């Protein structure tokens, strides 16, 4: 649907193809940091989180949307599956004056806040820009304005009900779900920036960012109005954070970037269409695509070529044993590693998961985290019973993250239920 959106907005299949690739395979200049040596370049394919689109040591954080958003984050995948066709309908509803489409648009987006709140907010801001366009550029008649009113009323009422006890409650509960913060992940808590504001986006987004201004003035008036919704997203996301993790504002910024890719694709295709010699035209486009996409090509290539293992054979064997022999409702005391085989492979409940899961979406499990440390460092039978622990795991993750873990206390009191390599599990109950 992203391609269909681009084709509808730009009026050209060729421009739509370029916009599609600029968005899904576009990247900045992060690849330059890996050209210093063969070893550094090889690290793209062998290192952990060392790619031209995700290299935090140099403040490169504009990740590839396929590898780092759509595949690992189901909410983003589901949200974009609704948002992109919704934007397609918004364009036809507003800019092509097909007012009858408001019903289908409303029906499509009614569940969006429950699927992906950031996509819902992005849609609101783009609709606001399109609504302003309608007021300014079209007759203010009932036939023109009534569909907007019905669309806003239906979505407003349903979305309010959906978000009342979730999004709104979390935003106002004092857990820092909604607060002011400057310049996304480049901004620091003291108000300073890690990099110069413009240099941060130049090296992260690259060619598309450099061409945004000429692309905006080259665009047609309706395309500029649509991009105005993207600018509203950018301004809001640069000053307001909507969740405890500042980084997650990128789910808004990528929609601004999507609209920018449309304009830049149109600009590049129109520029090179003026080059009469086809070989030079092709060479120019290929050079632009290389500059704009090389980082993402390396990032995606890394996924196919990297050969490190997430779990060892011992981890898999332990997970199989747990799956076959542990009660389905058993609770395990483990480290909070997001790769813990008990949870990620065997699917059993654990006391405390990684903070990278839902903690940054407003679920506060500080008590569970503190209990995890106490049960490893200062274990107590009463405290074990209080948290309903059935099994306790000791492995390399436990000893590396909890330095004072007291395995001897468990070994003296409970039977060794499982042992494999460096992993041992003690059974607490029964």
Regions found by a protein language model. Give the residues of each.
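Transmembrane-helix signature of polytopic, membrane-embedded enzymes
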Residues: 6-60, 95-97, 278, 282-285
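Membrane-interface alpha helices of multi-pass inner-membrane proteins
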Residues: 67-70, 89, 102-117
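Hydrophobic alpha-helical membrane-interfacial segments at the cytosolic entry of transmembrane helices
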Residues: 19-22, 139-165, 208, 212-214, ...
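Hydrophobic/aromatic-rich transmembrane helices and adjacent perimembrane loops
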Residues: 1, 76, 121-123, 245-273
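Transmembrane alpha-helix segments characteristic
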Residues: 100-111, 126, 148-153, 219-241, ...
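Perimembrane helix-loop-helix junctions
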Residues: 90-97, 105, 122-153
